[in-house]
Structure formats: C-alpha cells, structure tokens
Amino acid sequence: MRLKLFFCRHCKTVVNVRSGDGSRLTCCGEPMEHMVSHNSFDDGWEKHLPVVERVGDELYVKVGKTEHPMLEDHHIDWIYVETLRGGIRQRCLDSPTAVLHPVGIPVAVYAYCNQHGLWKVNL
C-alpha cells in the first residue's frame, strides 16, 4: 500500500499512514486532512516539484527547477523521501534543499509548501 499523509490545520502535525485508510485520524479535536499531492501538470510546478540527484546512497533534493523562496510566509516546510521500507523526512530551515540517506529503495520524493501544498515526484 502506498503512503498517505494526513495534516492537522491547527498544530501542523503530519502523520504518515502506510496501512489502513487513516480516515479516523484526529488531532486537536478535529479530523486530520488527507494531503493530496500536486504533479508536473499543475501550475507552479517549476518552483515546487522536487529535483532529485542520486549519488551513491545519498539523495540530493532541491525543490523547484527554479529555486523556491524561503520567506516567513511562503516557504518549503519539509522534504520527505518515501522508500519501500518506510521513509525519511527533513525540515527545511534556510534552504529548500536536503541531502538524505534513505534506508531502502527510494520510490518517491515529496515537498510541502506552506502556501501551495504537497508536491510529489516518483523515482
């Protein structure tokens, strides 16, 4: 079963669900929102789709063909690499980039923009 991400609008908690449908997840007293990813056919892809380069066991991820801004009110919050065995997420503090060392075979990379939502590229 593929990864499903759920988001709390109040506290910004993100939950990864790999089995089940997650339909009963709640946080801060309300149901969590299922995060649906955009793709390369959606407007804004050039600043939001992850660009991935693999070097050995490392994945170098840059968000956007044109680098995404990192402003207080508009930024990439995190990058997530999904693997066949789970995944790894890294917060983006100063730059919309990450060097990740995933355990297992990477199958997709996600980036979350606080203004434009979740973006995904399959590997």
Where are the model-predicted features located?
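Residues immediately within or flanking Cys/His clusters that coordinate Zn2+
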Residues: L5, R24, Y110
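Short cysteine-rich clusters marking metal-coordination/redox-active sites
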Residues: C8-C11, C27, C113
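Cysteine-rich micro-motifs
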Residues: D21-M32
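Edge beta-strands of extracellular beta-sandwich domains
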Residues: Q115-L123
